[in-house]
């Protein structure tokens, strides 16, 4: 048996201050659930041997997973144009939160085909799972300039922190108790 459900929500409001300046935010939320159960019965199937474990007359298994994601990107965008010059400045911040939890269970020899559920009393039982949460937060700025659409220059800078950096980080800038990486670019 398989049950799968998903929910997504995305909102992106925008406010125009004038024809050159606007602010916008993108908010996204996703929830995903996955539940699976399987059963190999005793009746109609042969007993099988599991290497290094033993003989199995039937098998019950279950898998459950839930993933929850949250994303937000808020920015302000300013553009200047005249006959020869074009300049665009963008600055904002992003936040990401992702949480994934799963469990997998398996057991053998339920005793009869009327008890297809996984329980602690089954032979050769195996249980595993994952519980992973990570977050990241970034400030960013970008500047694009061109002269008569012939000569271009672009520069950007982002400052990001994430739980994936870990706690034993020596590089970057330490602010508010966490380490931030600086990522400049020019082209």
What are the roles of these predicted feature ranges?
Residues 92-94:
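N-terminal glycine-rich FAD/FM-binding segment characteristic of electron-transfer flavoproteins
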Residues 1, 38-58, 99-127:
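Surface-exposed loop/turn segments flanking beta-strands in extracellular/periplasmic regions
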Residues 85:
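Histidine-centered active-site/metal-ligand motif
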Residues 4-80, 134-187:
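Surface-exposed extracellular loop regions of Gram-negative outer-membrane beta-barrel proteins
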Residues 88-90:
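Long, low-complexity, repeat-rich, intrinsically disordered, solvent-exposed domains used
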Residues 96-97, 185:
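Alpha-helical scaffold segments in carbohydrate-active enzymes
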Residues 121-140:
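Outer-membrane beta-barrel signature, preferentially recognizing the C-terminal barrel domain
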